[in-house]
Amino acid sequence: MAGHRMARMAEEIKRELARLLRDEMKDPRLGFVSITAVEVSGDGRHAKVYVSVMGDESARDNSQAALKQATGFLRTELSKSLRVRYVPELVFLSDLSIERGTRIARLLTEMENHDDAEAPR
């Protein structure tokens, strides 16, 4: 039962943070950020927020710095929409899975093109 409640809270946090980043954040360091997952601890006091940032490593670093600085603002805004006693402490972590998936897809396409070029006609 508690696991289901934490999963529901994680999904609600993910949805609300995505809205806040899209509509409320005005920090120019914040690039194109997608929230890929949220994990809430069993007691609901801590949440790991996994973000994917489009761009190079400096864009990722700038976005991480902007998110870290905005953590207090984001928690305050979450407290207005979440119906919980304690709003979790937010920790933003880079999620490189989308970037890795794109790289693998590109490598597979290159291999396929290379095989087509070498095939006898």
UniProtKB/Swiss-Prot annotation:
Main location: cytoplasm
Gene Ontology cellular component list: cytosol
Gene3D superfamilies: 3.30.300.20
SUPFAM superfamilies attached to this UniProt entry: Ribosome-binding factor A, RbfA
Any single biological process term in GO: maturation of SSU-rRNA
Function: One of several proteins that assist in the late maturation steps of the functional core of the 30S ribosomal subunit. Associates with free 30S ribosomal subunits (but not with 30S subunits that are part of 70S ribosomes or polysomes). Required for efficient processing of 16S rRNA. May interact with the 5'-terminal helix region of 16S rRNA.
NCBIfam families assigned: rbfA
Subunit details: Monomer. Binds 30S ribosomal subunits, but not 50S ribosomal subunits or 70S ribosomes.
Protein name: Ribosome-binding factor A
Annotated source species: Heliobacterium modesticaldum (strain ATCC 51547 / Ice1)
Organism lineage: Bacteria, Bacillati, Bacillota, Clostridia, Eubacteriales
Encoding gene, per UniProt annotation: rbfA
